[in-house]
């Protein structure tokens, strides 16, 4: 990638109104100044270990390994404080915002996990937080809305458009443009205009760095295959990036939803085409007129119609395989992991688990397969129980 211009091959860039250009340049320059600063790194590391609970374990799944006929490990991002990998990024960006003298954080959220992680970081660093969340997502994730409010964040339900993550992001960008002098927009995935995809990737790379080290310690070699779910793609890029130059197969798993027909999935890299959304050029789910298409996924965190520009480049280079699984397969994987390993995965993460279960015949006995378990499933238990016909 040309770091200076923020392009990954042909993807990425800064397609934003003039009012935001200065803020993006300011953020880029502050990040380059601070990312290698020993004081900043030490403070971030201290928060990640003492507060977020890193490093996270690399858990060997005995029962699933036996069933799949290979060695299956889970990288346990579900054990990070707050229940998902999101805090790796929000702590980093909140510290960055503080160092830049910003007085307030705003964020967009889909499943609510990024909103919760931003609220946690804001509370820990004493920065006020406002979160934009689609009305439909607020309804799907009531518990996360309450969690955010409990930690002092103000949640703005967004009623425009499809009332989901795309619309929440539009509102957050509008708010940022109005209050850019004292506000930091804390983007939750490797999307948006440069330098956001780079910053989020770097803060999430701790996942892959730890996995690399832990696998060498446990197995004496690197994994054969890494598998992670892809919505915007931050847990996946965090897992993949530190091993891109190694001989490791990588699979990103998108939301196949109900079907691969328009409006029924969130499989951007499998069904989309290049276009511009939220300030960057990347693959998009769009109609013939170039309008952003309707998406669907069983998991609120994977129904984003775009994807990180670096993933778009990795797809076109054939460095990473991008696959998909369907909603019903995800539910099976959700139940399977809970039942056989005693670990309830987030519906997002269950997409990655499902891919391994579904493709178990393609692995050899000695293959080491690492799944990024990006989050825990507590937030999904009540909606899944309804799908299974149970009581809440």
From Swiss-Prot:
Cofactor requirements of the protein: pyridoxal 5'-phosphate
Pathway assignment: Amino-acid biosynthesis; L-tryptophan biosynthesis; L-tryptophan from chorismate: step 5/5
Keywords, ordered alphabetically: Amino-acid biosynthesis, Aromatic amino acid biosynthesis, Lyase, Pyridoxal phosphate, Tryptophan biosynthesis
EC class (word): lyase
PROSITE patterns: TRP_SYNTHASE_BETA (PS00168)
Residues passing through the membrane, by range: none
GO molecular function, one term: tryptophan synthase activity
Post-translational modification N6-(pyridoxal phosphate)lysine, affected residues: 86
Lyase among keywords: yes
Pfam families: PALP
E.C. number(s) listed in UniProt: 4.2.1.20
Catalytic activity line of the entry: (1S,2R)-1-C-(indol-3-yl)glycerol 3-phosphate + L-serine = D-glyceraldehyde 3-phosphate + L-tryptophan + H2O
Keyword Phosphoprotein in annotation: no
GO CC aspect terms: cytoplasm
InterPro entries: Trp_synth_b_CS, Trp_synth_beta, Trp_synth_beta/beta-like, TrpB-like_PALP, TrpB-like_PALP_sf
Function: The beta subunit is responsible for the synthesis of L-tryptophan from indole and L-serine.
Family: Belongs to the TrpB family.
Oligomer status and interactors: Tetramer of two alpha and two beta chains.
Protein's recorded name: Tryptophan synthase beta chain
Gene: trpB
């Amino acid at each position: 990638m040309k770091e200076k211009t923020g392009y990954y091959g042909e993807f990425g860039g800064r397609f934003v109104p003039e009012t935001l250009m200065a803020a993006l340049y300011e953020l880029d320059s502050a990040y380059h100044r601070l990312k290698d600063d020993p004081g900043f790194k030490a403070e971030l590391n201290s928060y990640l270990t003492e507060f977020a609970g890193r490093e996270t374990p690399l858990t060997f799944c005995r029962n699933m390994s036996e069933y799949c006929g290979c060695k299956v490990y889970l990288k346990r991002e579900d054990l990070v404080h707050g229940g998902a990998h999101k805090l790796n990024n929000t702590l980093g960006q909140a510290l960055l915002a503080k160092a830049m003298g910003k007085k307030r954080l705003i964020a967009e959220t889909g499943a609510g996990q990024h909103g919760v992680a931003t609220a946690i970081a804001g509370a820990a660093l004493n920065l006020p937080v406002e979160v934009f969340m689609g009305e439909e997502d607020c309804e799907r994730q009531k518990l996360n809305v309450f969690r955010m409010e409990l930690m002092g964040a103000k949640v703005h339900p967004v009623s425009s458009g499809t009332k989901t993550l795309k619309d929440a992001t539009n509102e957050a960008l509008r708010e940022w443009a109005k209050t850019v002098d004292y506000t930091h927009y804390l983007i939750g995935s490797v999307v948006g205009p440069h330098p956001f995809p780079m910053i989020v990737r770097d803060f999430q790379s701790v996942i892959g760095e730890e996995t690399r080290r832990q696998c060498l310690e446990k197995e004496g070699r690197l994994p054969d295959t890494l598998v992670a779910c892809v919505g915007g793609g931050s847990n996946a890029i965090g897992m993949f990036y530190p091993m891109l130059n190694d001989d490791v197969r990588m699979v990103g798993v998108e939301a196949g939803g109900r079907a691969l027909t328009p409006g029924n999935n969130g499989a951007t890299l499998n069904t989309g085409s290049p276009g511009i959304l939220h300030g960057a050029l990347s693959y998009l789910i769009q109609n013939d007129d170039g309008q952003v298409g309707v998406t669907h996924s069983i998991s609120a965190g994977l129904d984003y119609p775009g994807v990180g520009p670096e993933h778009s480049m990795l797809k076109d280079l054939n460095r990473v395989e991008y696959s998909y699984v369907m909603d019903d397969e995800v539910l099976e994987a959700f139940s399977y992991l809970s039942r056989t390993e005693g670990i309830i995965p987030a519906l997002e993460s269950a997409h990655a688990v499902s891919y391994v279960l579904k493709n178990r015949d393609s692995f050899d006995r000695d293959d080491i397969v690492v799944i990024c378990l990006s989050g825990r499933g507590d937030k999904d238990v009540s909606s899944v129980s309804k799908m299974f016909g149970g009581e809440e």
